[in-house]
Amino acid sequence: MVKLESLKKSYQFKKALKERKIHTDYFSIFASKNFFKPKYKSNLLISFVMKKKIGNAVKRNKIRRKLKANVQKLLKKKGAINRDYTYIVFGKSNAYTQKQDVLLPLMEKSFSKLKK
C-alpha cells in the first residue's frame, strides 16, 4: 500500500513550486522530479495546501479530505500517478461545493498531463 508523505521544509516547497504546474477551477497541482528520498521507497511525496482566505478550518479540511481521497483512489489505478515526482496540491474554494465524482476525472486528467 502506498502511503502519502508530506513535505516538511520550506525549501522543499520552493523547489517543487518552480517546475511543472497545472491549474483547474478546483485545484492546482505543482510537480517536480523527486529531489530527496521519501522515508520509505513506496511512499508518495505529496502535500495538500489551502489558503486561509478560503474559509474556516472546517471548510479547508473538508477540501483537503476530498482531494486526498481522490489521490488515494488514483493510486489504486496502475500508472495514474508517477511516484518519481513530488507534488503539491493547492485546493481552491470551488472544490468545497463540488462532488467528489466530478473532481476525480479532473484530477486524473491533470496528473496524466504532468507525466508528459
Predicted segments with their positions:
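Positively charged, solvent-exposed patches that mediate nucleic-acid binding
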Residues: 1-116
